[in-house]
Regions:
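Cap/lid segment of the alpha/beta-hydrolase catalytic domain
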Residues: 231-320, 508-519, 668, 681, ...
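Short beta-strand/loop motif that positions the catalytic acidic residue
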Residues: 464-466
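Accessory cap/linker subdomain of secreted extracellular hydrolases
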Residues: 257-260, 269, 291-294, 298-304, ...
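Alpha/beta-hydrolase fold nucleophile elbow
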Residues: 323-335
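N-terminal cap/lid segment of alpha/beta-hydrolase-fold proteins
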Residues: 196-236, 643, 647-649
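Glycine/threonine-rich phosphate-binding loop and adjacent beta-strand/alpha-helix elements that clamp
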Residues: 55, 85-87, 158, 187-191, ...
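Extracellular and organelle-lumenal recognition/adhesion modules and their flexible linkers in secreted
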Residues: 20-195, 618-623, 627-628
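Bacterial Sec-dependent N-terminal signal peptides
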Residues: 1-22
Length: 797
């Protein structure tokens, strides 16, 4: 799920935009102070600072954490960053909450170059007009000792320790003998910072902001922020672009502006009337929130409301109350907002002309929290975001994420025990955890939330957007496009898939990488200008006659590293090929003459890790593994490796991939993880942007992967155990690809039975509900994969 800047700002103490949270462009330091003696009083942080150039950015930060683990006062100077090359004092003032526990003070540096800080001072207003200083450690950096890379008394909060260093300077002092000097070097992907800085000024200069409580048909009011171009008039009208989100549309207040008010810099500069709404039950909106609100097909009264009706009512209000619009509305959103975009397009308001569900959630049994019904344990940490009830409308986060006891997610989850034990310890009152654990199968609870089944007789034009390396909602993008195609002949429906992780097309990073692999320059900008911008411009500002000049499918080939155009997706100029998991762990294009098998022992106490990235295994959601080098897994005895010889010609796979396994187990349940891998030649050179310590020679690039639980082999609604030692057929989708395996490369398939902690462990002893499994239910089992197992894919002619 795509959580924008507001969550990242809280989690990382400092960040002004999602771009910085996702890239190695920033560093921060902090001190913690006991706030309890100062509860209810005013405070003021002052410090001197300067930057080497106006192309970099620094900020002071104050955050107050309350005793209830929720955040109180917070200011990171997002709206007034430090970009001065001369010394100047800056300050943050605010009130300490009555139930305050801890005050965090510090500074942030973003970008390359030198940053300077001195003379930190935290003061408390003891009586009206009288301020007293709170003791800080090394506030003026006169103790010129660097310990563990930091000045004495200060703690790290940083994105990349290799790209920032700290030292003391006597030549650039503000006060006393020394000042702190921070240096950013070789920081890549500065496009996001530069874009952020330029858009911040552009939005304030070119848009007016207004806020409203918009009534729905049942009386509930939805909080709405409107950004209108200043040059809008009766002679210069603009279309409306709507975004509905559960993640907060802040900053709230007519004088506080968001920097990225639209889908892209391109569209912001072209100008639209941008409308943002907190969805029902979230943040400043009234009502009660429901995850993946079930769609009501036949509404019988005003009390029958869903996301479709809320979108309809919102658009109706906009047309009547927002001046200078041209009568056309568009809607877009990434991840959860993508779900709301899909929902808004069903039984849509006639003015809704164009929509773009981007990495949309389609069905929680295949997106985000599950893959083929297997629980995505890597999501465990973010359950409070979606499962803690809100007491009343608020402009603050009301939930609290539990503190990570270690950055090593693999070790934490392995030692934490069963899902039952984890839930009892952390989420006893979390309603989403209760829903997930009480509905282990694809019952009516999940089926009612499958929004794509309602995509029939749709009217708006669609641009469906996804990323080939989207760990969260790859399924959602592909199935949304396919359901529209299948059930709506004649609808304008196009799709684009790029070399992106979840939502990464929304922010330009310059030299685009996913994890360790470089894919090209300015790819997000290309998408924003040539695909997304062109789509909305045509349907909202131009003729809307469907002659957009865009292909039905604009797909990035992850082997050739270039976009390709298709008249339809999946493509039809293909030959269906089978790749058999042959004897001696060979991968063959011919069926075996005799049936043999490969076997391995699966031990739930020693599961196969899904990544070698220790800290990445305990993130908000697992992401980088989608293109990760698989050599770490290939060497394990509980991972089977099937491989072709060196290819004598290019082979391009395009479209759906099917897995057909013939297996057995000594247990009564098992998981099956299948990974399709491009093995680079032994002489593959590194790119200019390959990270230090990484070699592409022999790199095992994971192209596509998926997990399947045996109990669901015949039905996701009615699971059943396996019969020990009985050969059993397991079929599932590996999802679509467009990838050229080049001459000299090898094609590899890995098969394993755990993928931890991205996904939960199978006990391998059948139990009706794995969420209720006891520790004694987890057993070792021997799995066999027979040589008549195969992967089926389309080879483009």
């Amino acid at each position: 799920m795509f959580k924008p800047c507001y969550l990242f700002a809280i989690l990382f103490f400092l960040l002004p935009a999602v771009t910085f949270a996702q890239n190695d462009t920033w560093v921060a330091i902090q001190q913690k102070i006991d706030a309890k003696p100062f509860a209810g009083k005013n405070m003021r942080l002052t410090a001197a600072a300067k930057t080497e150039s106006a192309s970099t950015m620094a900020m002071l930060v104050v955050r107050v954490d309350n005793t209830d683990k929720k955040m109180g006062f917070f200011d990171n100077m997002e709206d007034r960053p430090i970009r001065q090359t001369a010394w100047k004092t800056y300050s943050i003032e605010g009130k300490i909450n009555d139930n305050a526990d801890t005050i965090h003070i510090g500074s942030i540096c973003v970008g390359n170059g030198h940053f300077y800080f001195d003379d930190f001072l935290l003061e408390i207003e003891t009586t009206p007009g009288n301020w007293s200083a709170v003791p800080l450690v090394n506030a003026g950096f006169e103790t010129n000792t660097i310990s563990k890379g930091l000045p004495e008394g200060w703690q790290y909060f940083m994105s990349n320790s290799e790209k920032f260093s700290f030292s003391f300077t006597t030549s650039q002092t503000y006060k006393g003998t020394y000042s702190l000097q921070v240096m950013g070097k070789d920081v890549e992907d500065m496009e996001g910072l530069n874009s952020y800085l330029s858009m911040q000024a552009f939005v304030k200069a070119n848009y007016n902001k207004s806020e409203f409580q918009v009534p729905m048909r049942d009386g509930i009011r939805i909080y709405t922020i409107v950004y209108t171009p200043k040059d809008a008039s009766s002679a210069n009208k603009y279309p409306i672009m709507l975004n509905r989100t559960p993640y907060s549309i802040g900053p709230y207040g007519k004088d506080k502006f968001s920097s990225f008010i639209g889908p892209s810099e391109t569209m912001i500069k072209e100008k639209y009337i941008f409308v943002h709404q907190d969805v029902r039950g979230r943040y400043m909106s009234e009502g009660v929130w429901t995850n993946m609100t079930p769609h009501i097909e036949k509404k019988k009264s005003k009390k029958d409301v869903d996301e479709s009706s809320d979108t309809y009512d919102g658009i109706e209000w906009m047309l009547k109350n927002i001046p200078f619009h041209n009568g056309r509305v568009g809607q877009s959103g990434i991840s959860y907002p993508g779900f709301y975009t899909t929902a808004g397009s069903i039984n849509a308001h006639p003015a809704l002309k164009a929509v773009s569900p981007q990495a949309p959630i389609a069905d929680f049994f295949w997106d985000d929290f599950h893959h083929n019904g297997v629980f995505t344990q890597g999501y465990f940490w973010n359950f409070p975001i979606f499962g803690e009830p809100r007491e009343k409308p608020t402009d603050q986060d009301w939930y609290q994420l539990f503190e990570k006891p270690t950055p090593d997610g693999y070790d934490f989850y392995r030692r934490a025990g069963t899902l039952k034990e984890l839930g009892e310890k952390y989420y006893g009152k979390n309603f989403l955890w209760k829903e997930v654990t009480e509905h282990p199968n694809y019952d009516s609870f999940w089926q009612s939330r499958r929004i794509v089944k309602h995509l029939r007789n749709v009217k708006p034009a669609y641009l469906v957007v996804g990323g080939w390396f989207d760990a969260e909602d790859l399924y959602g993008a592909l199935i949304t496009y396919k359901e529209i195609e299948k059930n709506n002949p004649g609808a304008y429906n196009i799709i684009t898939m790029g070399p992106f992780g979840h939502g990464d097309w929304a922010a330009e990073t310059g030299h685009h990488k996913h994890h360790q692999l470089y894919w090209g320059d300015s790819l997000a900008t290309f998408y924003q200008r040539e695909i997304e911008g062109k789509f909305f411009r045509h349907f909202l500002k131009e003729s809307g006659d469907r002659n957009t000049g865009l292909p039905d499918a604009y797909m990035f080939n992850t082997g050739k590293k270039e976009y390709e155009k298709f008249d339809q997706w999946p493509p039809t100029n293909v030959v269906r090929k089978k790749m058999y998991l042959g004897a001696n762990e060979s991968l063959q294009f011919e069926a075996p003459a005799t049936i043999d098998y490969s076997s391995f022992v699966s031990d739930p106490s020693k599961p196969v890790p899904y990544t070698m990235d220790i800290e990445g295994s305990f993130g908000i959601t697992p992401r980088n593994y989608m293109s990760e080098d698989q050599r770490f897994a290939a060497s394990r005895p509980d991972v089977l490796v099937f491989e072709t010889g060196e290819l004598t010609e290019d082979i391009t796979l395009g479209g759906e991939i099917k897995v057909n396994l013939s297996v057995s187990t000594t247990g009564s349940d098992a998981d099956w993880v299948v990974k399709l891998i491009d093995v680079y030649p032994g002489n593959e050179p590194n790119s200019k942007y390959t990270p230090k310590g990484v070699t592409l020679a022999g790199y095992q690039h994971m192209v596509r992967s998926e997990i399947m639980r045996s109990r669901f082999r015949n039905s996701f609604e009615n699971p059943e155990p396996m019969t020990p030692d009985k050969v059993t057929a397991i079929h599932f989708d590996l999802q679509d690809v467009l990838h050229t395996f080049k001459k000299g490369h090898r094609i590899m398939v890995q098969v394993q039975s755990s993928w931890f902690p991205a996904f939960d462990r199978n006990p391998q002893k059948y139990v009706p509900n794995i969420y209720k499994a006891e520790a004694t239910d987890f057993i070792k089992a021997t799995h066999k994969v027979f040589t008549n197992s195969f992967i089926e894919a389309d080879v483009i002619k």
